[in-house]
Every structure is written in structure tokens, then in C-alpha cells.
Swiss-Prot record:
PROSITE patterns: RIBOSOMAL_L36. NCBIfam families: rpmJ_bact. GO terms for molecular function: structural constituent of ribosome. One of its GO terms (biological process) is translation. PANTHER family: 50S RIBOSOMAL PROTEIN L36, CHLOROPLASTIC, LARGE RIBOSOMAL SUBUNIT PROTEIN BL36C. Keywords: Ribonucleoprotein, Ribosomal protein. The keyword Ribonucleoprotein applies. One of its GO terms (cellular component) is ribosome. It comes from Oenococcus oeni (strain ATCC BAA-331 / PSU-1). Transmembrane segments: none annotated. It comes from the Bacteria. Signal peptide: none annotated. This is Large ribosomal subunit protein bL36.
Length: 39
């Protein structure tokens, strides 16, 4: 999982969600696209 200051969907399968107050991107097609917003 990548931790980035700004998270963006990388493909059509990417979903932007909010978990425990953190913005995350999950992707069923490519797990490399997983991201979490952080410092």
C-alpha cells in the first residue's frame, strides 16, 4: 500500500473510500493501486 499526500484513482476499477477517517483507494483489478492518504 502506498501512503501519499493526495490519493487519486489510477484506473476504472479504483474506488475512493473513507475508513476510520482516512481516505483510501482500493482496487479489485490491480492491488498495486491500493493507496492511503497520510503525511
Amino acid at each position: 500500500m502506498k501512503v501519499r499526500p493526495s490519493v487519486k484513482p489510477m484506473c476504472d476499477q479504483c474506488r475512493v473510500i473513507k475508513r476510520n477517517g482516512r481516505v483510501m483507494v482500493i482496487c479489485s483489478a490491480n492491488p498495486k493501486h491500493k493507496q492511503r492518504q497520510g503525511k
